UniProtKB/Swiss-Prot annotation:
SUPFAM superfamilies: S-adenosyl-L-methionine-dependent methyltransferases (SSF53335). It holds the Pfam family PrmA. Methylates ribosomal protein L11. GO terms for cellular component: cytoplasm. It is found in: Cytoplasm. InterPro entries: Ribosomal_L11_MeTrfase_PrmA, Ribosomal_PrmA_MeTrfase, SAM-dependent_MTases_sf. This is Ribosomal protein L11 methyltransferase. The gene is prmA. It is an enzyme of class 2 (transferase).
Length: 317
């Protein structure tokens, strides 16, 4: 079967928005190459041990997001829709850089596995290592290994937002904790929480592919007795409360979620919110405060932030 590879040159800031546009346009799988990932690796000598040397020869400015569309009658319409949607992003405050959209015809076998050669075992926390299921890795003492095959779902663990969320979970989650993972993607944060000792984790996503991939990764990591995967949104599929809620999505959705998240947190419950570009931090903080949440701290990595907040004054349980 023939596929059309759609490549979009953009910025690290716009990566998630561009990826979402591709998914909305009907792509089957997304890959992301981001120069910020290399900058982060340069800050950690240890991480270089896990990078394919072929990557170091690749010249990349900004970010390159690729998606794949089947060659079909409505292809031209979908491509035009993608181009128009990318062009509109600056109106929402995003710097898209070149915003250049190009296409290339490829065979299915060319794209469905080629991205795997760039996905290597990576430290995403003090003791957390994400390892692709097809890679060999010798575990060091004290390390927690997360086996991942993200498939078509967003979330390999190497993005700044995922790393920051994982690092905060590593500091916070303990035995008997209940954790909700909102917009679970590939399930990586749910698995991290489970392996950190959480008693119960509920992973929620609106996307059917994300639900399937999360369940597969949960099973592969032997945490299906802890992690329950639910299809839908938080308000519709969850009725209980959590000690920690983590949401690695985008700023606008965090703002919407802030209105309801207090109804799902236990007394002194913690809300870990990421997927937030630096320009949106103050707006998100203001909304969290307006909805009875107290800002604990803000951490940044590259052009992204994670905001940690907690419920003011507790709740009646």
């Amino acid at each position: 079967m023939k596929w059309i590879e759609v490549s979009i040159k953009t910025t690290s800031e716009a990566v998630e928005a561009v990826a979402n546009i591709l998914y909305d346009g009907g792509v089957a799988g997304v890959s992301i190459e981001d120069e910020n990932d290399f900058s982060l690796l340069e800050q950690s000598n240890e991480a270089w041990d896990y990078v394919d040397e072929a990557l170091l020869d690749r010249e990349l400015e900004g970010a390159l997001v690729k998606g794949y569309l089947p060659e079909a009658a409505d292809l031209a319409y979908k491509l035009e829709l993608i181009r128009q949607s990318v062009a509109l992003l600056p109106k929402y405050g995003l710097n898209i850089g070149l915003g250049e959209v190009t296409t290339l015809e490829v065979n299915e076998e060319d794209w469905s596995h080629s991205w795997k050669k760039y996905y290597k075992p990576t430290h995403i926390g003090k003791n957390i290592v994400v390892k692709p299921t097809w890679e060999e890795y010798e575990r060091k003492e004290g390390e927690m290994i997360i086996e991942m095959d993200p498939g078509m779902a967003f979330g390999t663990g190497t993005h700044e937002t995922t790393m920051m969320c994982a690092q905060e979970l590593e500091k916070i989650v303990g035995a008997k904790y209940t954790v909700f993972d909102i917009g679970c993607g590939s399930g990586i944060l749910s698995i991290v929480a489970a392996k950190l000792g959480a008693e119960k984790v509920i992973a929620v996503d609106l996307d059917g592919t994300a639900i399937r991939v999360t369940q597969e990764n949960v099973d592969a990591n032997d945490v299906s007795d802890i992690v329950e995967v639910r299809h839908g949104n938080l308000m519709d599929v969850v009725t209980s409360r959590a000690d920690v809620i983590v949401a690695n999505i985008i700023a606008d959705i965090i703002i919407l979620l802030s209105k309801d998240v207090k109804n799902f947190l236990k007394k002194e419950g913690i809300f870990i919110a990421s997927g937030i570009i630096l320009d949106k931090v103050e707006v998100v903080k203001a909304q969290l405060i307006a909805n009875n949440l107290e800002i604990v701290k803000v951490e940044t990595m590259g052009e992204w932030a994670v905001i940690i907040s907690k419920l003011k004054g507790g709740v009646d349980e």
